[in-house]
């Protein structure tokens, strides 16, 4: 059963808020970054990737964020517009802040890493005064991403967006998106992630991300069931815990659980899997699919993206996912 109820009389399906950055993916693979000579530029950032994926699948999508007042900022905004994402609430930073950069290293399909430049980034300068209540109430759903909670004023902007969402019955998706390099300590991270999760209808994260959120609780032993049940005492209706190549498990407040598998593919790199999974899973739920069907879409989308060089450019259409699912071997 799909427990989510969306307000159907709204012009936007999904609004994402948070990180907008640039990915520079290594063109030379099977080697360390020290030996990489060229990179290809893509729009990046977890909420940006999810918004792009959702738009490719047919959802009417918008974004609340902030970009640098330079060529990189204009590149990001232009790319989102080209992908039919409403950019009315993407603000331009006037303080001299820059666009975050993510350099990727692809030594092998199993050995990929990211080198991040996140000092003085524009996306974390999003101010609460730049979060429009009128804009949020036009949407059926809001996606927040954990990285936007790392610093003020972005942190307060996200919590204000959450308040507006609850006021206007906007379904909230929380993609945990834990990036240690943006935080001062695990304790600080856990506090703000827990506060955001308490106000979310759907929480999506890896087992490791949920472990981080539980560090302050001093659990002697935790498991997926215990983790999920903790959130059902708050707003959560669905908790998805991802286990990489072992698939994912979705828990619902009525006590049910659903296991999602993966689709066999030729893996080029591992990053981008979570964002593509989230975009297709959210799309499926918003189309009224049952949770197992939405999870299959997510798994197929993830397998497509990890077989390609980019994350944002590789986000598939609904037709591409359907064609892939017809031929690829599903591993449950």
Swiss-Prot record:
EC number: 2.7.1.92
Single annotated GO MF: ATP binding
Catalysed reaction equations from the record: 5-dehydro-2-deoxy-D-gluconate + ATP = 6-phospho-5-dehydro-2-deoxy-D-gluconate + ADP + H(+)
Name of this protein: 5-dehydro-2-deoxygluconokinase
Pathway: Polyol metabolism; myo-inositol degradation into acetyl-CoA; acetyl-CoA from myo-inositol: step 5/7
InterPro entries per record: Carboh/pur_kinase_PfkB_CS (IPR002173), DKG_kinase_firmi (IPR022841), Myo_inos_IolC (IPR030830), Myo_inos_IolC-like_sf (IPR023314), PfkB_Carbo_kinase (IPR050306), PfkB_dom (IPR011611), Ribokinase-like (IPR029056)
HAMAP family xrefs: IolC
Keyword annotations: ATP-binding, Kinase, Nucleotide-binding, Transferase
Described purpose of this protein according to its UniProt entry: Catalyzes the phosphorylation of 5-dehydro-2-deoxy-D-gluconate (2-deoxy-5-keto-D-gluconate or DKG) to 6-phospho-5-dehydro-2-deoxy-D-gluconate (DKGP).
GO biological process: inositol catabolic process
Major enzyme class: transferase
Organism field: Bacillus thuringiensis (strain Al Hakam)
Domain of life: Bacteria
Family as reported in the entry's similarity comment: Belongs to the carbohydrate kinase PfkB family.
PROSITE patterns: PFKB_KINASES_2
């Amino acid at each position: 059963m799909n427990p989510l109820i969306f307000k159907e009389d709204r012009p936007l399906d999904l609004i994402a808020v948070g990180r907008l950055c640039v990915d520079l993916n290594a063109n030379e693979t099977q080697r360390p970054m020290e030996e990489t000579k060229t990179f290809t530029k893509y729009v990046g950032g977890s909420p940006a990737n999810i918004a792009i994926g959702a738009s490719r699948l047919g959802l009417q999508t918008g974004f609340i964020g902030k970009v640098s007042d330079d060529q990189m900022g204009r590149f990001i905004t232009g790319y989102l517009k080209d992908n039919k994402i409403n950019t009315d609430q993407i603000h331009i930073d006037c303080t001299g802040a820059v666009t975050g950069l993510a350099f990727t290293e692809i030594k092998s399909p199993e050995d990929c890493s990211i080198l991040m430049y996140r000092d003085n980034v524009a996306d974390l300068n999003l101010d609460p005064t730049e979060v429009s209540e009128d804009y949020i109430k036009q949407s059926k759903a809001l996606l927040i991403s954990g990285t936007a909670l790392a610093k003020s004023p972005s942190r307060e902007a996200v919590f204000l967006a959450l308040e507006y969402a609850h006021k206007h019955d906007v379904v909230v998706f929380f993609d945990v998106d834990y990036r240690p390099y943006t935080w001062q300590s695990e304790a600080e991270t856990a506090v703000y992630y827990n506060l955001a999760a308490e106000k979310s209808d759907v929480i999506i994260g890896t087992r490791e991300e949920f472990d981080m959120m539980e560090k302050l609780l001093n659990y002697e032993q935790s498991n997926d069931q215990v983790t999920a049940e903790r959130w059902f005492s708050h707003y959560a209706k669905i908790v998805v815990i991802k286990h990489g190549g072992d698939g994912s498990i979705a828990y619902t407040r009525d006590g049910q659980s659903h296991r999602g598998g993966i689709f066999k593919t030729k893996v080029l790199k591992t990053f981008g899997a979570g964002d593509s999974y989230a975009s297709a899973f959210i799309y499926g739920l918003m189309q009224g699919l049952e949770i197992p069907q939405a999870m299959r879409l997510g798994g197929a989308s993830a397998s497509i993206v990890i077989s390609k060089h980019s994350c944002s450019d590789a986000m598939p259409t609904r037709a591409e996912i359907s064609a892939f699912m017809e031929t690829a071997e599903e591993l449950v």
